[in-house]
Amino acid sequence: MNRKEISKVVDLVRESNPLVHNITNVVVTNFTANGLLALGASPVMAYAKEEVAEMASIAGALVLNMGTLRPEEVEAMLLAGKSANVNNVPVLFDPVGAGATSYRTEVARHIPAEIELAIIRGNAAEIANVINERWEIKGVDAGAGNGNVVSIAKQAADELNTVAVITGKEDVVTDGQRTIVIRNGHPILTKVTGTGCLLTSVIGAFVAVEKDYVKAAVAALTFYGVAAELAAAKTVEKGPGSFQIEFLNQLANTTSGDIEKYGEIEVI
């Protein structure tokens, strides 16, 4: 897997304009929709249990994000996820804050038990808590801790029969057999709420057009990281507000050529 190979997926997303169904949290809904639109995908935010199964059945990908967790949304996620499975629509799960509370952790473990996942994406603490491995967490954005990130990712991929994506200073993608590290991105991403949640939805757009989910995830992470680097180069001295706006611009303007030029990936 090389930069030229993954760069082609960016063009495919823009040519295909995939429909990404998001059941996400109230903090990030607007940013997620705008980010997907900038990229070239078509977002839909449908939450009502009366319609989620139908909407999921016609989507290119379904993204389940449990950031602002409520029982009615969990019910909707399960209905949508099972419909997506029946209709061969890939499901992505973002277990935001898994490990922070007992209820949140219970839901984070219940959803993968009920729904076949194409991708699970979170920080190291979240993924570790989903698979019941010890990892300290403080708040929903905690990611630092003691442990081997690659090992946790591989264990999650094996136990959940999915592609595991752990994001942080370096990003890890694995299906348990193939493991790739991506080293693109910028620290200012942590100063804008919703950048991790948007990332999961961006991976959804890539998964909708590329059935090799490892390749799709690596392409999405590299694209996202390069876009962040280009945006930061123009705005980092101004601050996170300016960065957020420019990041949306770069999601629209970052090309496959930029991926080939700036992408930093390593197969391990």
From Swiss-Prot:
Which pathway features in its UniProt record?
A: Cofactor biosynthesis; thiamine diphosphate biosynthesis; 4-methyl-5-(2-phosphoethyl)-thiazole from 5-(2-hydroxyethyl)-4-methylthiazole: step 1/1
The cross-references to InterPro entries, in alphabetical order and at most eight, read: Hyethyz_kinase, Ribokinase-like
Q: Name one GO molecular function term.
A: ATP binding
EC number(s) per UniProt?
2.7.1.50
Q: Does the keyword Kinase apply?
A: yes
Q: Briefly state the protein's biological role.
A: Catalyzes the phosphorylation of the hydroxyl group of 4-methyl-5-beta-hydroxyethylthiazole (THZ).
What's the protein here called? Hydroxyethylthiazole kinase
Q: Tell me which species this is from.
A: Bacillus cereus (strain AH187)
